[in-house]
Amino acid sequence: MGAALTILVDLIEGLAEVSTLTGLSAEAILSGEALAALDGEITALTLEGVMSSETALATMGISEEVYGFVSTVPVFVNRTAGAIWLMQTVQGASTISLGIQRYLHNEEVPTVNRNMALIPWRDPALLDIYFPGVNQFAHALNVVHDWGHGLLHSVGRYVWQMVVQETQHRLEGAVRELTVRQTHTFLDGLARLLENTRWVVSNAPQSAIDAINRGASSASSGYSSLSDYYRQLGLNPPQRRALFNRIEGSMGNGGPTPAAHIQDESGEVIKFYQAQVVSHQRVTPDWMLPLILGLYGDITPTWATVIEEDGPQKKKRRL
């Protein structure tokens, strides 16, 4: 080992001297680039036939000793590197063989891939010893990462279906309730309208005959209407005011009603009687009661009897 160190020190000193004399770098000398450059210049000078190799070296200012050192160092370095690599290989193989013989002599031969990278073994519970509960947390994370996405997708789809179904049911119920409420409101308004309407019992055929007679009489009196026209001409303003004053005075004093204010009734007006007690109850005559109850969806006792009589008769049980 000491001889190798001595050779290495001498090599370093020689490289420094040669580099100083020739101007070549130590890296170029070790790699062989300096030798290749010198050989190229010497070859160029000798091919011209002017001088020999020794004369060419002297011309470049390089002695034979320096040239020999430059040509020897790359070969020496390559051989030394190969020897060192071989020694390291042999030493490493010996160390591995010793380790195998010492520690794996009584162990079983592994059946795993022999080219697999070797890693140091660690106890799985080591992290749980240092950090209690970390293994459970890591397991939960792995579970969520593996099938958590599918679980969330399934739960989300189930929730969405429930929301859609519940919304549909609520909408159907709301529409149904709104329809029923509007129908009841309309029927109630119609019933109240019928209760508060002025009802008149009229004889339609007699009214038609009277209208025909009036039309015939008006046609026969076509010529007499001309005299009536002149007779019924409009009054001047003073006459009109005097006439209005007489009419208002007679109406205010309870006098007879002028003929212009008398309205011809087309039939007999039905009079409605209100409740005797002040309870704001609705009053309906008997002849209108089935119609009002029918609008509210109720069945009167009379109608119930008719339906029961006209409906299917139940068969009596035989004893």
UniProtKB/Swiss-Prot annotation:
Chain segments carrying region DNA-binding: 306-319
Protein name per Swiss-Prot or TrEMBL: Minor capsid protein VP2
One protein family per Pfam: Polyoma_coat2
Gene Ontology MF term list: DNA binding; structural molecule activity
A GO biological process held by the record: viral penetration into host nucleus
Organism listed in the record: Murine polyomavirus (strain Crawford small-plaque)
InterPro entries per record: Polyoma_coat_VP2 (IPR001070)
GO cellular component, one term: host cell endoplasmic reticulum membrane
D1: region residues: 266-301
